[in-house]
Design a protein with these regions (language model features):
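Flexible, glycine- and charge-enriched loops at secondary-structure boundaries
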Residues: 3, 7, 49, 160
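Active-site beta-loop-alpha junctions of metal-dependent nucleic acid enzymes
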Residues: 1-21, 26
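Compositionally biased, low-structure terminal segments
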Residues: 11, 15, 44, 75-76, ...
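Basic, amphipathic alpha-helical segments enriched in Lys/Arg and hydrophobic/aromatic residues
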Residues: 149-223
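Extended amphipathic alpha-helical interaction segments
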Residues: 19, 25-28, 34-159, 178, ...
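Short amphipathic alpha-helical segments
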Residues: 9, 31, 162-166
Length: 224
């Protein structure tokens, strides 16, 4: 738990992961200014991927797409041809040129959006460099909504330390509880806990988990 989402907080988080021998290849996040410098300090070889959902939402808000039709066609074309169909470098180039050529005439505002995407192209499409890497934070956002729902039943904590202990217990439970309702490409996760796919096979099994009655993990081939 950290009091603010700043470079210091991210640095401490990454350092703890480093101390646990957790090898980070990619960090998927929204556009927080402190993440990149913190990542470079601890995991200089790791890549940053900006969340497409957040990035597109910022453009949608800037252009008032939900309430005005003026830029709606531009936005839908951008989302389709660049962020959905842009599954490799060539398609990204083609998508950007298509939108620039057909939807930005005489509009410096729209042209600036395209040039900004080109300028930040690497952090927007780094996910293509790692197989099955997500390009959004939907999963963690869903996880956070579950946590927020659980916190509604808690009246309060006596101290920051007690809140930290409660959160640790919540995370342990969530990490060791088998999935039951996964569908589509995530269906294989059912009957497995998330810890099965991340913990190293040679890792020491914490006593606290044994005390909680969590003493067996059925490692799958996905954890190799």
């Amino acid at each position: 738990m950290y009091p603010a989402e700043d470079e210091m907080a991210f640095s401490q988080l990454f350092q703890k992961l480093y101390d646990l021998n957790y090898d980070i290849k990619m960090v998927v996040a929204d556009d927080r200014p402190g993440i990149k410098p913190a990542l470079n300090k601890v995991f200089p070889y790791a890549k940053l991927q900006l969340c497409h959902v957040h990035y597109l939402e910022n453009i949608r808000t800037e252009l008032r797409v939900r309430t005005e039709e003026r830029y709606r066609h531009f936005f839908n074309s951008l989302r389709l041809h660049v962020f959905i169909e842009g599954t490799d470098e060539k398609k990204i180039d083609q998508g950007l040129e298509h939108v620039l050529r057909n939807h930005t005439a005489h509009s410096p505002k729209l042209q600036d959006i395209i040039w900004e995407i080109k300028r930040r192209r690497e952090v927007l499409f780094n996910y293509l460099k790692i197989q099955d890497c997500p390009n959004n934070t939907n999963l963690i956002e869903l996880y956070n909504s579950h946590l927020a729902g659980r916190l509604k039943t808690v009246k309060g904590f006596q101290s920051f330390f007690s809140a930290q202990k409660w959160l640790n217990a919540f995370l342990i439970r969530r990490r060791t509880k088998p999935f039951t309702d996964c569908e589509g490409k995530f269906k294989y996760l059912n009957k497995h806990s998330s810890l099965e796919f991340t913990i190293k096979k040679q890792a020491f099994w914490p006593d606290v988990l044994t005390k909680l009655g969590i003493s067996k993990i059925n490692f799958s081939e996905k954890s190799d």
